[in-house]
């Protein structure tokens, strides 16, 4: 019996030595290493003004004029739709390019220098019309976002007055300028 006990005692130290050697020789498979990656992106300033048409006609007919005063007023509701895309808060300004309409006479009349202020505008959802000037006037302000952002798409109404005593027959043209800024 002593023989079998001594064999067991000899086997355990040999097994312990074998495990110790394996720990030294076998690499640690449970190790871990990390690396950090920095992602960089540059976002440009986005500022875009779209308009549905660059030409609006406001023709007067003989029946538009008051027989007693000779005055006429024409309104074009929904004359222009403007759409803003911006990643900053924005402002749209409006002004006339010149102080008077250009004039091409129908019958050789002299240029009456029809004032630009005979043309008025308003945002469709606003109250009264405002006579245009040659100075930038704030028409609308809005929030950053696309054209689907509330308030970033809006409609403009136009109004033009005429007076038989001052406006000879012909074609009157006025350039109006919308300017989008992001302060």
For every predicted segment, state its role.
Residues 2-16:
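Bacterial N-terminal signal peptides that target proteins for export
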Residues 6, 20-21, 52:
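Residue-level detector of alpha-helical transmembrane segments in integral membrane proteins
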Residues 117-128:
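Short beta-strand segments and strand-loop junctions that repeat across beta-rich extracellular domains
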Residues 27-114, 137-183:
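N-terminal small/polar-rich segments of proteins
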Residues 17-19, 29:
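Cleavable N-terminal signal peptides
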């Amino acid at each position: 019996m002593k023989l079998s006990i001594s064999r067991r005692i000899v086997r355990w130290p040999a097994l312990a030595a074998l495990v110790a050697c394996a720990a030294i020789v076998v690499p640690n498979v449970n190790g871990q290493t990390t690396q950090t990656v920095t992602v960089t992106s540059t976002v440009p300033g986005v500022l875009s003004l779209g308009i549905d048409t660059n030409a609006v006609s406001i023709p007067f007919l003989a029946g538009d004029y008051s027989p007693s005063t000779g005055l006429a007023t024409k309104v074009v509701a929904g004359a222009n739709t403007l759409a803003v895309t911006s990643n900053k808060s924005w402002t749209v300004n409006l002004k006339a390019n010149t102080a008077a309409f250009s004039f091409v006479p129908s019958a050789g009349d002299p240029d009456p220098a029809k004032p630009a202020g005979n043309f008025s505008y308003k945002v469709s959802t606003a109250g009264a019309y405002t006579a245009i000037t040659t100075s930038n006037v704030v028409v609308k302000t809005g929030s950053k976002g696309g054209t689907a952002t509330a308030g970033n798409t809006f409609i403009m109404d136009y109004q033009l007055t005429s007076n038989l005593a001052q406006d000879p027959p012909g074609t009157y043209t006025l350039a109006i300028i919308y300017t989008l800024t992001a302060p």
